């Protein structure tokens, strides 16, 4: 092998001799023209094996080693034109019925595709690639020349015939071999369309035979266009894997073709060419006139050199006879002799894709124009929608066959065909008008032929691709996408003018969708502002897009006054911590509550203002983009000149921002466009518009210089917003600074620090750790000065006879501006001042707010606080690795749920709780069920008694059926009594009135009942005997249950609501005879209404009337005291069980009680934590 690093000399071998010998031997063995008939190609004995060996050499040597040696040898051996093409001709004429010859033809096709594969210059090329690429490019041009078939050969038709059998097979029945044959056929057509004579290489006189016109004519004559139409129209059904190759073929056929010339007839095309020739002659005459002004005379054969004396007494040397004309010419030539070594900017290395360049125009002859127009019209009618729908879906799902370049092919081809559809409609209307046919009689065509690229899916794909290309600075892709977007807008604009209602409705819907997103507006503005030497194609595309978008949006906003757009902006959301509240420099030790400010996009609709949107184009970057575009004014056509004219007119007169154009280079450019040298052609209509525009701009500039002499200096520079405002209005723009929000309020965790001194120590040590020791020292100094001032005031106040002023508040004065800013922005400093007791004056928390030491602080208080702070400054904090002091400082919430506390305003309001064990419900429920607190306590005692009896064997526990029957009877009885409750018991008109006599009567009865009960309990404890309640009193009490009900209701009606609550609660707790809790006892029959108070009486606690407001849970009281007092209260059970026996069976309340008779406790359900607990032991 040759050394790639060695320089190429005469002795250097381009290709390894062994490789060349093997390849030449295979080509020789393939066959040749030797024989009786010199015009007939004769195959060798092992022709098929030779073709396969050559393919194997290409694959294993060139592709595997990334070289081009075998391809170079095959080109030198003339394999394509000398062997492969004759073999294909032989097969097409006589060997189509031979299976062997069909295999030979397919093998030839397999070699033609890699040998004609387009060559691109890229960054990964090796020395071997650079050595062989120029030769292979010339060889490929010769391959194309031979395939296109000069002299009437039909090799393209022959190649298509190879793939026809595979096309005829249904897609479901095709094998991998069939798909491969179709791919080979299409790739060869693609290669033929791509290959073109290289501009840097010698053409050898075959430009016309390999030009775009020759390719189009060959495709038309040899049925390649018919093949493409068939496959495009059926791409979704039969050729779904060939969509990308079809797109590439279309791209390389139509790229660079002028659509306007394509649809012209011969007369129009001839007139257009004549006009172009006239323009060229006019430019030549203009150049000659400019040259004649400074042309040398007949005496100019001698050299000329002069000295130019400048103002600073220096002399410069200028040569040439043209400097003798005048001093201005002399100075101009001297300026031209100066050279500016402009610094080279390191740009991003971009791939050179010559074959995919669509900005270079291509000229077609008349025959090729006619053939291409026929194909384009048929493709628009049948294949446009299926192909582009299928390709877009494949690109969106990133199919394996998709490459990065295919997205560019897609957008450019869509743009080209949309423009072709609009131009075709335009010339159709012109032809109908020339044929004296009314436009009304002509049936309008619908835009459904191109509907596949006018749907929402395409718009989403286009916007996403534009944003991606703009972000990644992919210039060529973005150029194709801008062209596509522009043509979509122009197509929609024409749809809006269609006579068909459906087209108008669809156009309005599309415009609404496009203009609704503000991100689309912002993207276009960013593209215009972001131009920087991306090339003329990019410049042309972005200026056209801005021009069309701005005009259509202006028109649409005028028709839709209430137009709404969706605006997306970034807002900052603070989750749990404020950036200004806590210093998060050390993220490892940050509190769990700290979170960084995160940004999210929110969408909201707002009314669209076109003036506001158009003003975004009024900046120096947009102006510079159009100025860079207009610098090519000599090469621009009328539409492009009009585009730039409309923009500058909008800037100067519609937006009243002509100051942006007052720059020397811009003014000089405008002047040269009108006055020369190299001015616009004055015979063109656009010249007059530009002339008037430039005149008005210069007039405004001169007038503005008279008003603002500072503009003379500003002519040298670009204008920023503040400069533009000053030059327009004569004064600086007044800006109002928006005040910042105060940081979040902090607090020290009260669980870690109880006293104020501890909290102060924590805050001070955290500030010292955060390197804010200067602020701590400043606070200490403020406290010292305040203590001295307060001490002097206190000493004056103690002197007798001297009137003293009231205790004044002492202002907290910051040392410098940084300290003043920290008083607002430093959350820990604000926490420290708050803990000390400093107060902020005023209601607004804004920067610069005043803080004062309140008058309530004494000098001793201030000195004590200062000592605490100074102690923290003197003694360094002990580093505890397990505890970070900064974690003890947290954000203070308005309603801190972590502490379980309530608002300070609601501390005195008891809302009650549903938690277990709490029966304190404000005002009680509206219709409460029977209270079970007393009964539950009795049940507990009964169960204990039953347990003792069971242990003694006195009695067995009743079965479950008896217990269930008794429980059901009790429940029915309780529900019946509850249903009798009337609302008058709880709500009465007299509740808002006061009755002192009723109050005194109520308290007297309560006091009497409490004393009697306390006396009975004391007697029972002292003597061990329970005072029995006779049958008479029991029956009497039973009778009073009915007779005293009316009295109880009257008493309740004359009391206040809160007092009624206390009384009824105590009656419910104490009266075991009234199960429903709605009847009061009379003084003659005291019950157990104050059992909880009696429990206190057991411990000899004196009872007062104030204890009447206390509320006890009887269950809680009994369970708490029962076990503790079991030893010294043996007869308590008798006292409690007697009335409980009456309540054991509510169905028979009048039955006489027998103390000695066995008693069965009622089976009551136990409730624990809201759950009913059933026990089998009951």
From Swiss-Prot:
<feature type="compositionally biased region" description="Low complexity">
    <location>
        <begin position="1138"/>
        <end position="1147"/>
    </location>
</feature>
<feature type="compositionally biased region" description="Acidic residues">
    <location>
        <begin position="1105"/>
        <end position="1116"/>
    </location>
</feature>
<feature type="compositionally biased region" description="Basic and acidic residues">
    <location>
        <begin position="981"/>
        <end position="991"/>
    </location>
</feature>
<feature type="compositionally biased region" description="Polar residues">
    <location>
        <begin position="1079"/>
        <end position="1092"/>
    </location>
</feature>
<feature type="compositionally biased region" description="Acidic residues">
    <location>
        <begin position="1148"/>
        <end position="1157"/>
    </location>
</feature>
<keyword id="KW-0236">DNA replication inhibitor</keyword>
<dbReference type="GO" id="GO:0006281">
    <property type="term" value="P:DNA repair"/>
</dbReference>
<comment type="subunit">
    <text>Component of the fork protection complex (FPC) consisting of tof1 and csm3.</text>
</comment>
<keyword id="KW-0469">Meiosis</keyword>
<feature type="region of interest" description="Disordered">
    <location>
        <begin position="576"/>
        <end position="596"/>
    </location>
</feature>
<dbReference type="Pfam" id="PF04821">
    <property type="entry name" value="TIMELESS"/>
</dbReference>
<dbReference type="GO" id="GO:0003677">
    <property type="term" value="F:DNA binding"/>
</dbReference>
<feature type="region of interest" description="Disordered">
    <location>
        <begin position="896"/>
        <end position="965"/>
    </location>
</feature>
<dbReference type="GO" id="GO:0031298">
    <property type="term" value="C:replication fork protection complex"/>
</dbReference>
<feature type="compositionally biased region" description="Basic and acidic residues">
    <location>
        <begin position="1001"/>
        <end position="1015"/>
    </location>
</feature>
<feature type="compositionally biased region" description="Basic and acidic residues">
    <location>
        <begin position="1117"/>
        <end position="1128"/>
    </location>
</feature>
<feature type="region of interest" description="Disordered">
    <location>
        <begin position="980"/>
        <end position="1178"/>
    </location>
</feature>
<dbReference type="InterPro" id="IPR006906">
    <property type="entry name" value="Timeless_N"/>
</dbReference>
<comment type="similarity">
    <text>Belongs to the timeless family.</text>
</comment>
<dbReference type="GO" id="GO:0000076">
    <property type="term" value="P:DNA replication checkpoint signaling"/>
</dbReference>
<dbReference type="InterPro" id="IPR044998">
    <property type="entry name" value="Timeless"/>
</dbReference>
<comment type="function">
    <text>Forms a fork protection complex (FPC) with csm3 and which is required for chromosome segregation during meiosis and DNA damage repair. FPC coordinates leading and lagging strand synthesis and moves with the replication fork. FPC stabilizes replication forks in a configuration that is recognized by replication checkpoint sensors.</text>
</comment>
<keyword id="KW-0539">Nucleus</keyword>
<keyword id="KW-0234">DNA repair</keyword>
<dbReference type="GO" id="GO:0043111">
    <property type="term" value="P:replication fork arrest"/>
</dbReference>
<feature type="compositionally biased region" description="Acidic residues">
    <location>
        <begin position="580"/>
        <end position="596"/>
    </location>
</feature>
<feature type="region of interest" description="Disordered">
    <location>
        <begin position="792"/>
        <end position="811"/>
    </location>
</feature>
<keyword id="KW-0131">Cell cycle</keyword>
<feature type="compositionally biased region" description="Acidic residues">
    <location>
        <begin position="911"/>
        <end position="921"/>
    </location>
</feature>
<dbReference type="GO" id="GO:0051321">
    <property type="term" value="P:meiotic cell cycle"/>
</dbReference>
<feature type="compositionally biased region" description="Basic and acidic residues">
    <location>
        <begin position="896"/>
        <end position="905"/>
    </location>
</feature>
<protein>
    <recommendedName>
        <fullName>Topoisomerase 1-associated factor 1</fullName>
    </recommendedName>
</protein>
<keyword id="KW-0227">DNA damage</keyword>
<feature type="compositionally biased region" description="Basic and acidic residues">
    <location>
        <begin position="1025"/>
        <end position="1034"/>
    </location>
</feature>
């Amino acid at each position: 092998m040759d050394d790639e690093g060695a320089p190429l000399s005469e002795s250097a071998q381009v290709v390894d001799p062994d490789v060349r010998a093997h390849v030449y031997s295979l080509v020789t063995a393939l066959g040749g023209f030797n024989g009786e008939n010199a015009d007939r190609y004769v195959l060798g004995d092992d022709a098929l094996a030779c073709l396969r060996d050559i393919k194997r050499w290409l694959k294993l040597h060139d592709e595997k080693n990334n070289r081009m040696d075998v391809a170079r040898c095959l080109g030198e051996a003339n394999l394509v034109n000398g062997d492969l093409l004759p073999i294909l001709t032989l097969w097409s004429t006589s060997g189509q019925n031979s299976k062997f010859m069909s295999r030979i033809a397919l093998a030839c096709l397999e070699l033609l595709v890699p040998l004609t594969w387009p060559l691109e210059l890229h960054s990964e090329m090796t020395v071997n690639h650079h050595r062989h690429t120029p030769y292979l490019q010339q060889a490929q041009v010769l391959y194309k020349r031979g395939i296109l078939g000069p002299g009437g050969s039909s090799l393209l038709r022959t190649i298509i015939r190879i793939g026809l059998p595979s096309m005829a097979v249904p897609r479901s029945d095709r094998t991998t071999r069939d798909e491969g044959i179709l791919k080979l056929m299409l790739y060869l057509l693609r290669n033929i369309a791509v290959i073109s004579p290289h501009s840097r290489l010698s053409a050898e006189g075959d430009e016309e035979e390999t030009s775009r016109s020759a390719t189009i004519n060959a495709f038309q004559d040899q049925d390649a266009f018919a093949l493409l139409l068939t496959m495009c129209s059926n791409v979704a059904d039969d050729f779904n894997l060939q969509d990308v190759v079809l797109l590439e073929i279309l791209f390389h056929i139509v790229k660079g073709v002028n659509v306007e010339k394509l649809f012209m007839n011969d007369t129009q095309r001839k007139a257009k060419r004549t006009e172009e020739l006239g323009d060229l002659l006019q430019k030549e005459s203009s150049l000659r006139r400019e040259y004649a002004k400074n042309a040398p005379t007949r005496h100019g054969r001698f050299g000329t050199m002069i000295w130019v004396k400048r103002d600073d007494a220096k002399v410069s040397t200028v040569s040439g006879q043209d400097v003798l004309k005048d001093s201005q010419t002399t100075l101009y030539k001297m300026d031209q002799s100066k050279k500016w070594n402009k610094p080279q900017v390191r740009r991003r290395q971009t791939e050179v894709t010559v074959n995919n360049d669509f900005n270079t125009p291509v000229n077609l002859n008349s025959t090729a124009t006619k053939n291409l127009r026929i194909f384009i019209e048929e493709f628009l009618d049948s294949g446009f929608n299926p192909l582009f729908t299928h390709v877009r879906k494949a690109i969106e799902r990133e199919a394996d066959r998709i490459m990065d370049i295919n997205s560019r092919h897609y957008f450019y081809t869509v743009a080209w065909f949309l423009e072709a559809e609009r131009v075709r409609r335009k010339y159709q209307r012109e032809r109908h008008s020339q044929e004296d046919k009314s436009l009304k009689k002509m049936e309008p065509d619908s835009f459904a032929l191109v509907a596949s690229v006018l749907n929402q899916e395409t718009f989403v794909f286009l916007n996403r691709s534009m944003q991606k290309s703009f972000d990644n600075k992919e210039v060529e892709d973005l150029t194709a996408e801008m062209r596509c977007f522009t043509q979509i807008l122009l197509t929609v604009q024409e749809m809006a003018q269609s006579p068909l209602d459906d087209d108008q409705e669809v156009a309005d819907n599309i415009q609404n969708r496009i203009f609704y997103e503000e991100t689309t507006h912002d993207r276009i503005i960013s593209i215009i502002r972001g131009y920087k030497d991306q090339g003329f194609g990019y410049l042309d595309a972005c200026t056209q897009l801005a021009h069309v978008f701005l005009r259509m949006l202006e028109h649409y906003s005028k028709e839709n006054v209430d137009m709404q757009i969706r605006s997306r902006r970034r807002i900052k959301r603070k989750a749990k911590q404020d950036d200004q509240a806590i210093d998060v420099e050390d993220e490892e030790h940050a509190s769990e509550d700290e979170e960084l400010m995160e940004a999210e996009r929110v969408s909201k609709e707002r009314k669209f203002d076109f003036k506001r949107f158009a003003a975004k184009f009024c900046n120096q970057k947009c102006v510079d983009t159009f100025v860079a575009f207009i610098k090519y004014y000599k090469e621009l056509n009328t539409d492009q000149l009009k585009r730039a004219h409309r923009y500058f007119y909008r800037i100067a007169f519609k937006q009243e921002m002509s100051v942006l154009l007052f720059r020397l280079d811009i003014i000089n450019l405008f002047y040269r466009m009108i006055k020369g040298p190299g001015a616009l052609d004055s015979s063109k209509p656009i010249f007059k518009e530009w002339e008037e525009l430039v005149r008005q701009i210069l007039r405004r500039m001169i007038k503005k210089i008279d008003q603002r002499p500072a503009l003379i200096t500003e002519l040298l520079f670009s204008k920023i917003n503040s400069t533009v405002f000053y030059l327009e209005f004569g004064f600086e723009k007044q800006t109002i600074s928006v005040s910042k929000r105060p940081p979040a309020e902090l607090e020290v965790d009260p669980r870690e620090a109880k006293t104020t001194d501890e909290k102060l120590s924590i805050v001070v040590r955290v500030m010292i750790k955060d390197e804010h020791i200067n602020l701590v020292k400043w606070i200490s100094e403020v406290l010292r000065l305040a203590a001295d001032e307060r001490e002097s005031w206190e000493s004056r106040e103690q002197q007798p006879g001297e009137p003293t002023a009231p205790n004044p508040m002492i202002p907290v004065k910051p040392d410098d501006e940084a300290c003043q800013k920290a008083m607002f922005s430093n959350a820990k400093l604000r926490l420290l001042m708050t803990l000390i007791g400093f107060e902020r004056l005023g209601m607004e928390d804004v920067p610069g707010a005043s803080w004062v030491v309140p008058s309530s602080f004494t000098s001793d208080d201030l000195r004590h606080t200062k000592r605490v702070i100074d102690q923290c400054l003197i003694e360094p904090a002990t580093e505890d690795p397990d505890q970070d002091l900064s974690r003890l400082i947290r954000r203070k919430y308005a309603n801190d749920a972590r502490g379980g506390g309530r608002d300070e305003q609601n501390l005195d309001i008891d809302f009650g709780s549903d938690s277990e064990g709490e029966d304190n419900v404000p005002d009680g429920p509206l219709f409460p069920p029977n209270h079970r607190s007393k009964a539950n306590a009795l049940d507990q005692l009964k169960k204990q008694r039953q347990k003792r009896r069971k242990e003694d064997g006195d009695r067995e526990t009743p079965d479950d059926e008896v217990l269930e029957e008794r429980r059901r009877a009790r429940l029915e009885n309780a529900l019946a009594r509850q249903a009798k409750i009337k609302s008058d018991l709880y709500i009465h008109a007299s509740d808002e009135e006061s009755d002192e006599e009723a109050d005194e009567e109520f308290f007297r009865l309560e006091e009497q009942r409490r004393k009697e009960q306390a006396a009975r309990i004391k007697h029972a404890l002292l003597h061990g005997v329970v005072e029995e309640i006779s049958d008479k009193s029991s029956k009497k009490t039973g009778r009073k249950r009915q007779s005293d009900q009316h009295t109880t209701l009257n008493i309740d009606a004359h009391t206040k609501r809160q007092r009624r609550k206390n009384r009824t609660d105590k009656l419910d707790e104490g009266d075991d005879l009234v199960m429903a809790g709605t009847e009061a006892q009379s003084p003659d029959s005291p019950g157990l209404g104050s059992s909880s108070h009696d429990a206190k009486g057991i411990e000899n606690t004196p009872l007062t009337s104030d204890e009447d407001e206390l509320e006890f849970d009887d269950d809680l009281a009994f369970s708490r005291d029962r076990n503790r007092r079991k030893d010294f209260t043996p007869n308590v059970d008798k006292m409690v069980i007697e009335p409980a026996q009456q309540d054991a069976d509510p169905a028979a309340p009048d039955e006489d009680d027998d103390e000695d008779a066995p008693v069965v406790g009622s089976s009551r359900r136990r409730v624990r934590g809201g759950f009913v607990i059933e026990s089998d032991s009951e």
